[in-house]
Amino acid sequence: MTQLFYDTDADLSLLNNKTIAIIGYGSQGHAHALNLKDSGMDVIVGLYKGSKSESKAISDGLQVFSVSEACEKADWIMILLPDEFQKDVYLKEIEPNLKEGKILSFAHGFNIRFGLIKPPSFVDVVMIAPKGPGHTVRWEYQNGQGVPALFAVEQDSSGNARSLAMAYAKGIGGTRAGILETNFKEETETDLFGEQAVLCGGLSELVKSGFETLVEAGYQPELAYFECLHEVKLIVDLMVKGGLSQMRDSISNTAEYGDYVSGKRLINSDTKKEMQKILKDIQDGTFAKNFVEECDKNKPLMTKLREENSKHEIEKVGKGLRSMFSWLK
């Protein structure tokens, strides 16, 4: 059984007398910065000139510097920028300010795994990746709880990188819930696969296809929305709480029987073969190469697909229904 590590396994004092620079102040950035600050750490924020996040960080009681200045001042640098921006910012602002003994850290391994960022040998390179969005990481911390996190060591120059990564995870509240050790390769590949095959790509297409099937058969679009999108959260919440078994214990016998006899008609060996192809594209770098090239061209395909998907009927129907949900206001 894989081991989880908790508060008693991590030594927060390892971060004492270290200045931690959080690069970026978006969803994860604000959560990391404020949780570390509330844990008693010396935290600063690095942002590009004119960033809309600057006033928010200042109002949250944090000192804000340019990325270059923050990295120069810091002992620990946590890069919390979108994947496609990290390489350029690293080369221009971060790398020139790296010195022996500094710690370079990430919350996702994409740029290290695919060789876009190649740190010098004299710094520690670690990862601390909360398994939840930033607002949840912050909310749970404020309520005395935490969000589970992954941690990994890519490069141990100091000989103490693992303990330092665990200390950081404790500082943001991860060890309250439990942290799991992994490596950059495993985290990156499984994270990308989960997003593409199940959580985002797979689920989005499943929801849309179900909605389309009902509407094309003459059913009310509003009912199709409820059955194929709205109720997804109800089922997923049961899965998260107690796995597939508890979900099935909580639904009707009719629903459970339909689960068993119809599920594999949709998700079958052919589906699994496509999943394996998706995983292979991730493992061999094909997806990363395509994504980097897409970003270098200013994302023309992604922009086109985003616009097309935003016009799907399920979006129009959902917007209308949600405006009538008093509990969402």
From Swiss-Prot:
Q: Is ATP-binding a UniProt keyword of this protein?
A: no
**Enzyme Commission number(s):** 1.1.1.86
Q: Which InterPro entries match?
A: 6-PGluconate_DH-like_C_sf, KARI, KARI_C, KARI_N, KARI_prok, NAD(P)-bd_dom_sf
Q: What class of enzyme is it?
A: oxidoreductase
* Alphabetical UniProt keywords: Amino-acid biosynthesis, Branched-chain amino acid biosynthesis, Magnesium, Metal-binding, NADP, Oxidoreductase
Q: How is the cofactor bound?
A: Binds 2 magnesium ions per subunit.
What the protein does comes down to: Involved in the biosynthesis of branched-chain amino acids (BCAA). Catalyzes an alkyl-migration followed by a ketol-acid reduction of (S)-2-acetolactate (S2AL) to yield (R)-2,3-dihydroxy-isovalerate. In the isomerase reaction, S2AL is rearranged via a Mg-dependent methyl migration to produce 3-hydroxy-3-methyl-2-ketobutyrate (HMKB). In the reductase reaction, this 2-ketoacid undergoes a metal-dependent reduction by NADPH to yield (R)-2,3-dihydroxy-isovalerate.
What's the protein here called?
Answer: Ketol-acid reductoisomerase (NADP(+))
